[in-house]
């Protein structure tokens, strides 16, 4: 019964994995809000099949000042925790008059292969600088302009997205089926070994009990009173 249950679980897992491997994955879209000290909305539209990501930073004019003049973005992309790409995406300028939006397009490794992959992309806002015009008067009464710089630093990370295999063929199915059969053979061998061991223990226990009973019987037969009764019966 236990073995049949195990086979049923393995079969269900096989069907589930095959369904995952042949599922078509559309562009993954998600939005998030940056950390509070950044005070800006960040929205991202990512297509993990083509390896393109577009990020829009919507600046808060009250926090950032009149003009947002510089935003420097850094991106780190992790592929299965073994491959990392670090690149500076853009140094863009924007103005409140055009909506304080900075569009950044990034690239990361295209999803390939037969296995499900985890891709984690994080965007780090290195600096968001603002300049404001301030009228000052010198001792001579001449008006000058200064541009004090305000820098805001924050870290924003996207969610970890699990990307399923996107393929028109079943190249990975054969390899997975071989691995599945190998695991199944190992499990069957292990369960068979354990079952044989248990059966052997039961046989040895039964043999020991019978041998003990046999020894007790012969000990009982060898007692003097038993022998005398047997001799009396023989004489009669």
Curated annotation (Swiss-Prot):
- Which residues belong to the signal peptide in this entry? 1-17
What residue ranges are annotated as transmembrane?
Answer: 184-204
**Species assigned in the record:** Human herpesvirus 6A (strain Uganda-1102) (HHV-6 variant A)
| Gene Ontology CC: one annotated term | membrane
Statement: the UniProt record of this protein carries the keyword Transmembrane helix: yes
Gene designation per UniProt = U23
Please classify the protein's predominant subcellular localization into one broad category: membrane
User: Where is this chain glycosylated?
Assistant: 67, 80, 103
> What is the superkingdom listed in this entry's lineage?
Viruses
What is the official name of this protein in its record?
A: Glycoprotein U23
Localisation: Membrane
Note the topology in the membrane: Single-pass membrane protein
Q: Which UniProt keywords apply?
A: Glycoprotein, Membrane, Signal, Transmembrane, Transmembrane helix
């Amino acid at each position: 019964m236990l073995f049949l249950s195990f086979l049923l679980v393995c079969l269900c897992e096989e069907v589930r994995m095959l369904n995952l491997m042949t599922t078509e994955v559309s562009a993954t879209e998600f939005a998030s809000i940056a950390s509070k000290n950044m005070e800006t909305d960040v929205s991202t539209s990512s297509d993990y099949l083509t390896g393109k990501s577009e990020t829009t930073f919507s600046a808060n004019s009250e926090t950032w000042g009149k003009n947002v003049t510089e935003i420097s973005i850094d991106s780190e992309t992790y592929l299965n925790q073994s491959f990392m790409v670090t690149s500076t995406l853009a140094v863009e300028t924007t103005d409140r008059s055009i909506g304080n939006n900075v569009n950044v397009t990034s690239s990361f490794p295209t999803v390939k292969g037969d296995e499900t992959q985890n891709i984690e992309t994080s965007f780090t806002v290195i600096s968001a600088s603002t300049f404001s015009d301030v009228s000052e008067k010198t001792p001579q009464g001449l008006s000058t302009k200064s541009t004090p710089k305000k820098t805001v630093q924050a870290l924003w990370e996207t969610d970890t997205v699990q990307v399923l295999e996107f393929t028109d063929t079943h190249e990975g199915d054969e390899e997975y089926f071989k691995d599945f059969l190998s695991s199944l053979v190992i499990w069957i061998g292990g369960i068979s070994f354990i079952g044989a061991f248990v059966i052997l223990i039961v046989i040895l226990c039964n043999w020991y009990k019978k041998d003990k009973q046999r020894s007790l019987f012969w000990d009982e037969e060898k007692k003097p009173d038993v022998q005398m009764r047997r001799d009396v019966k023989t004489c009669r």
